[in-house]
């Protein structure tokens, strides 16, 4: 990782992998979607064979596979999954929005009705690792919101099934509609349905570039959570921070994939040098050191600022997915941070605490979109309808003002819809 010294007022230009596919990649995704729409299940079987090298005999996970998963999962792992589910559920219960109504003296009733989505599809990535935490973070808020129909897609392994931890987590959450599908073809199936796959109203969950491009392509026909890019971490630290902790946390995101971003922002050159050395030392023994090493080489940086105030400005410019504040008084700085998906305060709030266990959602805005976007929440799985009930008295009192506005905009039929009622009063 390179140390980059910033002058006071100097803007940061951080290289990120981005979310935009090439013309060829976009064309490939569009072809996959259209083929799934036309050929249904057969397209899913063909694409799974082509891209994953797996010959599917059944698109759906069976009850026998779910039962078998419990026989192959370690009990400490299962206990950890159950506790994580409980923590995430308790946090998201606090987010539930309630319908509300108010009645005015003239009899007008105004309000907002909150109702859950009918059907949601959760994409759970496979490939380089198993991700039961993705199931928890996507399914739990949907359940808290009241969604009744939750299905899941995840790419099958070469053995024709999914990892035991993935299946057991789904079973613990009561998700039994699970399709052995991944990639753009899985997104297309959830969006438009096939002979086997039921279409849904919203698709959530992370995936590779082709999954992200497919979600972007089907948006509008169905809802999506967000177009999530590679994982990011930014550590804001002062000279009191433990360089070993900081290095470990940077590596915790760098090991996700080669496009992950890992950044330190500090006014302390001494800390930056110590973190640089510590990162190299810890990287050498990581099982995924090739992946993490490429990420740090491409998208890693150690920024040294002229002051702590400038460091905070840099953080707000970056608008990172994960922000750790590793300073002597982290709470004192919290109010000055404007843009971050999740904020971890203090030396013991390591980013993996939020990834797996604490309760807040780990599906977060990336690529600087924390400037305007928020973490996945219960709100993402509900709809809000405005309720308007005008009384005769209210319309008589306000009808003239309504027609004035309608005619100002040149919409005569709007005005007449009010006039015809006023004439009957």
Swiss-Prot record:
PROSITE patterns: HISOL_DEHYDROGENASE (PS00611). GO terms for cellular component: cytosol. Substrate binds at residues 231, 253, 256, 322, 355, 409, 414. Pfam families: Histidinol_dh. It comes from the Bacteria. GO terms for biological process: L-histidine biosynthetic process. Gene3D superfamilies: 1.20.5.1300, Nitrogenase molybdenum iron protein domain. InterPro entries: Ald_DH/histidinol_DH (IPR016161), Histidinol_DH_CS (IPR001692), Histidinol_DH_monofunct (IPR022695), Hstdl_DH (IPR012131). The active site is at residues 321-322. Its EC number is 1.1.1.23. Keywords: Amino-acid biosynthesis, Histidine biosynthesis, Metal-binding, NAD, Oxidoreductase, Zinc. Catalyzes the sequential NAD-dependent oxidations of L-histidinol to L-histidinaldehyde and then to L-histidine. PANTHER family: HISTIDINE BIOSYNTHESIS TRIFUNCTIONAL PROTEIN, HISTIDINOL DEHYDROGENASE HDH. Belongs to the histidinol dehydrogenase family. This is Histidinol dehydrogenase.
């Amino acid at each position: 990782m390179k140390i980059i010294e910033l002058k006071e007022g100097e803007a940061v230009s951080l290289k990120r992998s981005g979310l935009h596919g090439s013309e060829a990649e976009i064309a490939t995704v569009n072809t996959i979607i259209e083929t799934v729409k036309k050929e249904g299940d057969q397209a899913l079987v063909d694409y799974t064979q082509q891209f994953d090298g797996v010959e599917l005999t059944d698109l759906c996970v069976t009850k026998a596979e779910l039962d078998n998963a419990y026989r192959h999962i370690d009990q400490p792992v299962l206990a950890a999954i159950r506790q994580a589910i409980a923590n995430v559920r308790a946090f998201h219960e606090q987010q539930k929005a309630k319908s509300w109504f108010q009645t005015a003296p003239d009899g007008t009733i105004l309000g907002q009705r909150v109702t859950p989505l009918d059907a949601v599809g959760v994409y759970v990535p496979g490939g380089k690792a198993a991700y039961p935490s993705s199931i928890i973070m996507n399914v739990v808020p949907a359940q808290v919101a009241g969604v009744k129909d939750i299905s899941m897609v995840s790419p099958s392994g070469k053995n024709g099934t999914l990892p035991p931890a993935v299946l057991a987590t789904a079973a613990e959450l009561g998700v039994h509609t699970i399709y052995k599908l991944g990639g753009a073809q899985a997104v297309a199936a959830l969006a438009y349905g096939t002979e086997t796959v039921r279409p849904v109203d919203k698709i959530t969950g992370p995936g590779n570039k082709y999954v992200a491009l497919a979600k972007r392509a089907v948006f509008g026909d169905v809802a999506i959570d967000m177009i999530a890019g590679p994982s990011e971490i930014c550590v804001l630290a002062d000279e009191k921070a433990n360089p070993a902790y900081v290095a470990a946390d940077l590596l915790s995101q760098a090991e996700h994939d080669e496009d992950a971003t890992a950044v330190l922002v500090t006014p302390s050159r001494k800390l930056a040098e110590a973190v640089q050395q510590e990162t190299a030392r810890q990287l050498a023994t990581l099982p995924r050191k090739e992946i993490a090493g490429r990420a740090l080489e491409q998208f890693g940086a150690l920024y040294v600022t002229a002051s702590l105030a400038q460091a905070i400005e840099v953080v707000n410019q970056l608008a990172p997915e994960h922000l750790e504040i590793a300073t002597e008084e982290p709470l004192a700085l919290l109010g000055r941070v404007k843009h971050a998906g999740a904020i971890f305060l203090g030396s013991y709030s390591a980013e993996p605490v939020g990834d797996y266990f604490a309760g807040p959602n780990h599906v977060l805005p990336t690529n600087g979109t924390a400037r305007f976007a928020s973490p996945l929440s219960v709100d993402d799985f509900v709809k809000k309808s405005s309720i308007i009930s005008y009384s005769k008295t209210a319309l008589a009192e306000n009808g003239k003002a309504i027609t004035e506005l309608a005619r100002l905009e040149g919409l005569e039929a709007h005005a007449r819809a009010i006039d015809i009622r006023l004439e009957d009063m």
